């Protein structure tokens, strides 16, 4: 089961919180569709900002959007001009007041979304896939990850028949629900077709009770950074030593 299911959805309510926090009632379908439009727009609009996660919280008249990124300066802009422009664009989509919080991911090498997107962009830039994967694995393990697994699928090296190749280092225990496994899927559009990149990163294990509410909701007002480290783990977070 753990090998097939999405590791993030498998840990919701255990060690991982939800990315959409609101009560929809009878308008649940419309609200969910609006969330999907917001995420799709932000991912396209902020493609160069290395966006890791988008958390949406709603009240009756206000939508609070927290954007986790490793390059907050691109989103904020000079004097906060870019983030103000982004707020106005989102108001047209939602017809509601929008507040945007920017959370800086301090260790992007431990974020599966950022790692997967970086590999995909390198593949589009005609860099050899083995080199891109080995560089990603080395930088992730250097930052203290317990393990990483990367799978690339498609017409690798322009081969006529598509295939999948998997590279891994360390441990990624997908069946252990207390294991903090981050997962992401990215796509690279190349001349020979579409290549899929899947990344699993094990960042240790979580012991004891964990607050599932978004830990970055205390981010500063619009256009300011949160000084917490990316990942923002609580005090109960412990890493298993390598000799265990």
Curated annotation (Swiss-Prot):
Species annotation: Parabacteroides distasonis (strain ATCC 8503 / DSM 20701 / CIP 104284 / JCM 5825 / NCTC 11152)
Protein name: Small ribosomal subunit protein uS3
Domain of life: Bacteria
SMART domains xrefs: KH
NCBIfam families: rpsC_bact (TIGR01009)
Disordered: region residues: 222-244
Ranges for domain KH type-2: 38-106
GO molecular function: mRNA binding; rRNA binding; structural constituent of ribosome
One GO CC term, this protein: cytosolic small ribosomal subunit
Feature: compositional bias, Basic and acidic residues: 222-235
Oligomeric and partner information: Part of the 30S ribosomal subunit. Forms a tight complex with proteins S10 and S14.
GO biological process terms held by the UniProt record: translation
Gene from which this protein is expressed: rpsC
Keywords: Ribonucleoprotein, Ribosomal protein, RNA-binding, rRNA-binding
Family per record: Belongs to the universal ribosomal protein uS3 family.
The protein's role, per its UniProt record: Binds the lower part of the 30S subunit head. Binds mRNA in the 70S ribosome, positioning it for translation.
Gene3D superfamilies the UniProt entry points to: 3.30.300.20, Ribosomal protein S3, C-terminal domain
